[in-house]
């Protein structure tokens, strides 16, 4: 089972912030980080889940009605940590680029053995080389699941912008694109036929319906409690299930899921708010 950080380590730290992503990147054996993107009024890609800023910042209103400079003035409460702001996608790439490039090399088979989602590495995310044959100190690979938040409010040109950004940094192999909107995946597939795509929905049967419709997806991204297809029907597919549940500053329930049971349902990857419970 590969584990991904849902909006970073979003149970203990504010979701979709550089702080949450930095904490996630420190986890030994983490496969990747999931995040959400939207466009500002002036066409900049920012990382935020909700279409409005009300829940996660001290502001109010639609993300699309703010310029980047205006969004940067909004504060995100981070408790005892320095206050956070809504990050741009460029800032996230700058933070994680070295790890993502190692992940891209691992996916393409050109790296020196760095591999995400394994039991190698240290708490700081470096590979000791003891199990993969890589050189001591090599950064362990990390991948990024970029969800385009365009199923409620379509953002014209967001697909082109994010693909260009990923290609400019040479991170194609480190990125999975996902969205609830099948047409957006079709567009990404047209723009970048080699891109890895995941189709989102609540029930896995609805994910499969969209996939069969020709959206170009190779992975199914259902809610983990909505596995309404038999595991036999899911063989050969990447099933990257997502969780909701508690987010910062809510208290953790401390519940640990039984991974063997989830694998029996056909789930191959799990995107969760508190990956540190399993990997820390």
State the predicted function of each range:
Residues 1-110, 122-280:
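Phosphate-group recognition and catalysis centered on beta-loop-alpha active-site segments
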């Amino acid at each position: 089972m590969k584990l991904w950080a849902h909006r970073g380590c979003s149970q203990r730290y504010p979701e979709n912030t550089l702080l949450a992503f930095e904490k996630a990147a420190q986890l030994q054996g983490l496969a990747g980080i999931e995040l959400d993107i939207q466009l500002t009024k002036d066409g900049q890609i920012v990382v935020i889940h909700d279409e409005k800023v009300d829940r996660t910042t001290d502001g109010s209103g639609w993300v699309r009605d703010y310029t980047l400079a205006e969004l940067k003035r909004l504060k995100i409460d981070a408790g005892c940590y320095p206050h956070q702001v809504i990050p741009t996608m460029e800032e996230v790439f700058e933070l994680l680029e070295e790890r993502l490039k190692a992940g891209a090399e691992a996916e393409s088979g050109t790296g020196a053995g760095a591999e995400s989602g394994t039991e190698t590495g240290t708490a700081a995310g470096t590979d000791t080389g003891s199990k993969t044959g890589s050189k001591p100190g090599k950064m362990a690979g990390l991948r990024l699941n970029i969800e385009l938040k365009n199923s409620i409010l379509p953002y014209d040109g967001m697909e082109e912008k994010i693909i260009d950004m990923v290609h400019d940094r040479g991170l194609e192999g480190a990125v999975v694109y996902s969205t609830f909107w099948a047409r957006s995946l079709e567009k990404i597939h047209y723009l970048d036929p080699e891109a890895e795509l995941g189709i989102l929905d609540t029930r896995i049967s609805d994910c499969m319906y969209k996939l069969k419709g020709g959206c170009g997806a190779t992975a199914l991204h259902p809610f983990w409690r909505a596995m309404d297809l038999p595991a036999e029907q899911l063989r050969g597919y990447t099933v990257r299930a997502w969780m909701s549940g508690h987010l910062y500053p809510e208290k953790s329930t401390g519940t640990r899921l039984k991974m063997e049971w989830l694998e029996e349902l056909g789930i191959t990857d799990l995107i969760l708010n508190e990956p540190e419970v399993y990997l820390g």
